[in-house]
């Protein structure tokens, strides 16, 4: 009697791959008044490391500008994780890498952005949650339309 292999999905390691903050107009920018316009961009990526192990990245770039021209700060964080995925069908692996893993990583990236910006002397930046499932579906639809 053969044993059925059980699916495995686990977090092996969470880490910050890259973290940068630029305040190009310091210290003058701290004396200026106004409500900044904050722009956030998010991207994800993954790569296979070895059998069953994947490195997944969520990169968050936040730019704050005064009067839509003077940059207050530019903060970029790449939060990464090594995930173990075994005995999982390939279509489910892609879904886990594109949705589940980014959902796990994003709160860590959000905290890194907020903490870095606060330590730089600015008010905290509170980033709204991201619907990675909707992003994944859009990517799948775009790939299907291009095929």
Swiss-Prot record:
Location(s) in or outside the cell: Cytoplasm
GO biological process assignments: protein folding; protein tetramerization; protein transport
SUPFAM superfamilies per record: SecB-like
Molecular functions per Gene Ontology: unfolded protein binding
GO cellular component, one term: cytoplasm
Keywords associated with the record: Chaperone, Cytoplasm, Protein transport, Translocation, Transport
Family per similarity comment: Belongs to the SecB family.
NCBIfam families: PRK05751.1-5, secB
Subunit text: Homotetramer, a dimer of dimers. One homotetramer interacts with 1 SecA dimer.
UniProt-recorded name of the protein: Protein-export protein SecB
Gene transcribed to yield this protein: secB
